[in-house]
Amino acid sequence: MSRAMDITRIPGSAIGAVVAGADFSGTIDDTQVEEIWQALDQHLVLVFRGHKDPSNDDLLMFARRFGHVPKTGLTTGASPDHNEILLISNILDENGQKIGVGNAEWMDWHTDYSFRPRVSRIGFLAAVELPPSGGGQTLFTDMYTAYESLPDDLRQRLHSYRARHSLRSGYEDVIEEEYQGEVSIEGPTAKPFVAPEDGTATVHQLIARNPRTGRRAVYANPLNTKRILELDVTSSKEVLQQLFAKPGEPELTYAHEWLPGDIVMWDQLGTVHAKRAFDPTERRLLRKVVTIFDDPAEPWHPEDAA
């Protein structure tokens, strides 16, 4: 039987809780899984501390209790023996090649896999090596409350909009005809523009719905959301800029100061995250795993706003 956990809200923070006593050995039971789900539903970001550092196998086994873990598909930047694990690092190997992805600079607000048909449901980051002088904090913003705080008329309109997400820059300027008839996940003859685990661009509704809680979130981020299809270019930019002003608002945001051994788990559907810069002469390494929705349509519901 898994040992008891202690879950404590992070004082003074808009979101987030610290979880002590979690079992990463692969023996986590169904009761503890549901307890973690409920804590995630409430706090959106969970910081696990006071546990034995899990092996790659144990980390993956733990993550799989919360959904399907896809391979990264990368030939560089992933763990050599576990392609599902992305290495977030500025470290160079003996040949001067990066061992992972990322750098020491600011990483803009985003949510993982928004540019793929099967978006990420949960993210996990495990600290391995941290810059001694600090920096590199990971920031999380609550996009459920961001949605709920919008003016009623705007919130209603957002439910009729779809947005294009892309890993490629400049793609928002493609002619309108190319947008039409691209990604569709409806109907027996639907043909996705990209494969579920191999894509770099797709289209999603602008409002997502958490299948466990029913809460709705703005599903847009400055890094990957390029265009609202139903609006002209100017109007699309105006609406997106209004939405992009939400990430980082203090009353919606938690800034995680990393400690050795920390594992952070977060709701990818209802949050966006970013990374602060750190000294590029110092080393930083984290292991990253995500889960994705089994059904690509699960987070997207056409019903009107409540």
Curated annotation (Swiss-Prot):
Disruption phenotype: Accumulation of pentalenolactone D.
GO BP terms, alphabetized: antibiotic biosynthetic process; lactone biosynthetic process
Record bears the keyword Iron: yes
GO MF: 2-oxoglutarate-dependent dioxygenase activity; ferrous iron binding; L-ascorbic acid binding
Obligatory cofactor(s): Fe(2+)
Residues noted as binding 2-oxoglutarate in the record, renumbered to the chain: T138, W258, R284
Signal peptide segment: none
Keywords annotated in UniProt: Antibiotic biosynthesis, Dioxygenase, Iron, Metal-binding, Oxidoreductase, Vitamin C
Biochemical pathway: Antibiotic biosynthesis; neopentalenolactone biosynthesis
Cofactor annotation comment: Binds 1 Fe(2+) ion per subunit.
Other notes: S.avermitilis does not produce pentalenolactone itself in vivo but instead a group of new metabolites that are neopentalenolactone derivatives.
Function: Catalyzes the Fe(2+) and alpha-ketoglutarate-dependent oxidation of pentalenolactone D to pentalenolactone F. Also able to catalyze the oxidation of pentalenolactone D to pentalenolactone E. In presence of neopentalenolactone D, mediates production of PL308 and possibly neopentalenolactone E.
Family, per entry: Belongs to the TfdA dioxygenase family.
Name of the protein described by the UniProt record: Pentalenolactone F synthase
